[in-house]
Amino acid sequence: MTKQPNAKRHTALLGGTFDPPHFGHIRPLLDVLKHWPLQDCWLLPNHIPPHKPGTHASPKARLEMIDALCREFPAFSLCDVELRRDEPSYTVNTLRQLRELYPDRVFYFVMGMDSFLSLDKWFEWQQLFELCHLVVCARPGYQLAADHGMAEVLANRQHTEADLPAEDSGKVLIADIREQDISSTDIRTALAERRDIRQLVPESVARVIETQGLYR
């Protein structure tokens, strides 16, 4: 059995609009949970995403979709700290709040390679390494070139062991996972065109979308 490096709980975090949540979110997280001995995963829906113009479904509808998803997949839990804000959801502020609320946890913020490549444009991005570890998942069409600015960050911080880091923050873990070429935009387009989406979203999410007539 892979040992835990300390007595704290190790929790994966995935933020996003989840508009709607889909297998492109879920399958990489399930792979991450299989690869490392993380004990749970929290989904963090944004209220006001800082890098997007807004959302299509209401906060209430997105909350219901995520709540249904978490009932279908018990490894996931809803964390609504960002959804309750009336200001842009900057990741660094969320992590500061979570570290204060849950000092007994070590957080692993999960992102795609596309997000990691632009991490140096995030608000106070360097402070993230004081607050959490990063788990970077492959995304179709995105590779980290040797001369990219984030290559040095990865070289200095990459954790390559099978066990979790002994530190509470500061490492980058590269997840060798199944790439998922699924986007919320594609799903909304399919719904608007009355096409079937059940290969793209969990059954629980599809039921909420159908019951509420979302994205029509």
UniProtKB/Swiss-Prot annotation:
**Gene Ontology terms describing biological process:** NAD biosynthetic process
Molecular function via GO: ATP binding; nicotinate-nucleotide adenylyltransferase activity
What Gene3D superfamilies does the database record attribute to this sequence? HUPs (3.40.50.620)
Q: Pfam families in the record, alphabetically?
A: CTP_transf_like
Q: Which UniProt keywords apply?
A: ATP-binding, NAD, Nucleotide-binding, Nucleotidyltransferase, Pyridine nucleotide biosynthesis, Transferase
Q: Does the keyword Nucleotide-binding apply?
A: yes
Matches recorded under SUPFAM superfamilies: Nucleotidylyl transferase (SSF52374)
Top-level division of the source organism's lineage:
Bacteria
Task: State the function annotated in the UniProt record.
Answer: Catalyzes the reversible adenylation of nicotinate mononucleotide (NaMN) to nicotinic acid adenine dinucleotide (NaAD).
This protein is called what?
Answer: Probable nicotinate-nucleotide adenylyltransferase
Originating species: Shewanella amazonensis (strain ATCC BAA-1098 / SB2B)
Lineage, top ranks: Bacteria, Pseudomonadati, Pseudomonadota, Gammaproteobacteria, Alteromonadales
